[in-house]
Amino acid sequence: MKQVGLRIDVDTFRGTRDGVPRLLELLGRHGIQASFFFSVGPDNMGRHLWRLVKPKFLWKMLRSRAASLYGWDILLAGTAWPGRRIGAGNEAVIRAAAESHEVGLHAWDHYSWQAWSGVWPQERLALEVERGLLELERIIGRPVTCSAVAGWRADQRVVKAKESFDFLYNSDCRGTRPFLPQLGSGVSGTVQIPVTLPTWDEAVGTAVDIAGFNRYLLDCIHRDAGVPVYTIHAEVEGIAYADQFNELLTMAAEEEIQFCPLSQLLPADFSELPSGKVVRGELAGREGWLGREQLLTSGI
């Protein structure tokens, strides 16, 4: 069996309320555990609409059929009215996920992190993580041991800002395999587990059409020579394309692919991991900068 980390990002109020229960049902049916990363503060995702002036973002929204994919309640959230508090309004759903799956922090305010984390000082970065962490821990009633920043908006500043929270791992960038980010003076930071595989919205309309996506993704997994990690979104695979995701899980099992929480990808001895950095870069199918893995050693 080929082991693949399954990361589930939950960005919005509707994704939490409607998408997560459907995903829990599907994962339970297939006997799969995953890592859920929750946004718990205000849902201001509609404020991304200003990015439509950027051709690359506009093309992404058009080719992914964003209005039918996400729904207007998501696309307009937090624009003409204050965004609803995601965690406070969906505590039972988040607790249900925590009963059977690994649960980590995605963001306090997903929109603000994507829009401003690149210029925030380190103190503000740490404050945003702390706000989300305290809220998520209050909801699930236990310490949160992992996190994954919104939109992979991370660099070495973010790595350093998160060091005080004692996470087991972070999943803040795109890359090929888990690594130890270097903080300077020979000191290593918290393990990073990069996402290695394309997401639905990155691939559909560019590399493949909707009908061919499952086959495309499974072929990517088979070719992945690193430590494969796949990200889905509660707003996509948990709502509009839940049936297609169900088919993907069936096909994966038939091809001896086993999805698992990200923590199960870590070695017993972290000294085996390569060292590296999280640097800014770009990725086909995604607008704007994101964190990319830059390996400095190959590891054992």
Curated annotation (Swiss-Prot):
Alphabetized InterPro entries for the sequence: ArnD (IPR023557), Glyco_hydro/deAcase_b/a-brl (IPR011330), NODB_dom (IPR002509)
Gene3D superfamilies the record matches: Glycoside hydrolase/deacetylase
Domain of life: Bacteria
Pathway: Glycolipid biosynthesis; 4-amino-4-deoxy-alpha-L-arabinose undecaprenyl phosphate biosynthesis; 4-amino-4-deoxy-alpha-L-arabinose undecaprenyl phosphate from UDP-4-deoxy-4-formamido-beta-L-arabinose and undecaprenyl phosphate: step 2/2; Bacterial outer membrane biogenesis; lipopolysaccharide biosynthesis
Catalytic activity: 4-deoxy-4-formamido-alpha-L-arabinopyranosyl di-trans,octa-cis-undecaprenyl phosphate + H2O = 4-amino-4-deoxy-alpha-L-arabinopyranosyl di-trans,octa-cis-undecaprenyl phosphate + formate
Gene Ontology biological process terms from the UniProt entry: 4-amino-4-deoxy-alpha-L-arabinopyranosyl undecaprenyl phosphate biosynthetic process; lipid A biosynthetic process; lipopolysaccharide biosynthetic process; response to antibiotic
The enzyme's E.C. designation: 3.5.1.n3
Cited SUPFAM superfamilies: Glycoside hydrolase/deacetylase (SSF88713)
Top enzyme category: hydrolase
Gene Ontology CC: one annotated term: membrane
Keywords assigned: Antibiotic resistance, Hydrolase, Lipid A biosynthesis, Lipid biosynthesis, Lipid metabolism, Lipopolysaccharide biosynthesis
Domain (NodB homology): residue spans on this chain: 2-260
GO molecular function: hydrolase activity, acting on carbon-nitrogen (but not peptide) bonds, in linear amides
HAMAP family the record matches: ArnD
Similarity field: Belongs to the polysaccharide deacetylase family. ArnD deformylase subfamily.
Function: Catalyzes the deformylation of 4-deoxy-4-formamido-L-arabinose-phosphoundecaprenol to 4-amino-4-deoxy-L-arabinose-phosphoundecaprenol. The modified arabinose is attached to lipid A and is required for resistance to polymyxin and cationic antimicrobial peptides.
Name by which UniProt lists this protein: Probable 4-deoxy-4-formamido-L-arabinose-phosphoundecaprenol deformylase ArnD
Lineage: Bacteria, Pseudomonadati, Pseudomonadota, Gammaproteobacteria, Enterobacterales
